[in-house]
């Protein structure tokens, strides 16, 4: 098994901007697992998987999953307790 490359949250910035229409890299995100609060830019991003997976850098909880298909995109925010848009 190969190790996935871990990037910072800026790697998902363009995709998040496209989906939400605002730059989310500076937006605070609260982990639903451990309660840590970090800017999206400081979260761990995995792109070597089916879609994009954004994890808490403190407890590795999956915060956001984004999967793109030919005609639609699935976004799962279930791992977050909150995402502050400003």
Q: Could you describe each region identified by the protein language model?
A:
Residues 38-45, 66-69:
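Short Cys/His-rich "knuckle" micro-motifs
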Residues 44-53:
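Short linker/helix segments within small regulatory modules
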Residues 2-4:
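Cys/His-rich zinc-coordinating "finger" modules and their low-complexity flanking regions
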